[in-house]
Amino acid sequence: QLGDWSCHTLDGPFWGLDLGMPHTVEATVPNPRTQHHFIADESVTHMQFGARGNKPPVSLKWYEGGEKPPIRPEWGIKGFKRSGMLMIGDKKTLMTGGRPNDPVLLLSDEEWKDFQKNPPKKTIPRVKEEAPVDEWINAMKNNRLPGSHFGYAAELTEMALVGVLAQRFAAKIEYDAKNMKITNRPDIDAYIKEPAREGWSYGESL
């Protein structure tokens, strides 16, 4: 799931918090299947991101295979949907679906009514929901980059795949993003760039 859905589910925090690459990733896997080089279908993957300019460090957890985070009483909810995302801040918590869609601030009824009456100003360009092709065409017509251009999408995917490596080996990984190296596990580092067959090499810089 992490290698597939995270590019949808984690797009919001990755972009909004300017996460970049994690320096540490650890996967807790109740029933690892590493002997067959498979990824178990149940795990919790914990990513640690350092400070970014004036933004503080961030801890991110990815739950899959039935694993769920504990529910806090102040959220006022009884359970979670099948998939989704929580952004837990110092003051409030945002909950979305897995895409992530249908965002909801977990507030009391009074706070929610006040928020609806006095919403923050829209300072960020909006993209019509579930219309990425429209955004792509508009970007070409107006000579600008779409939100999910290759420069952005490649980093989002890299973050996810480092997590997948931790899942695959039920391991703790220390990641040097600048050099794209796993510094504490040479055996896992070998999987970042596997040798290409003759005639299929794509070079070092895409």
Residue map of PLM features:
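Glycine-enriched catalytic-core subsegment of oxygenase/oxidase enzymes
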Residues: 3-5, 10, 14-206
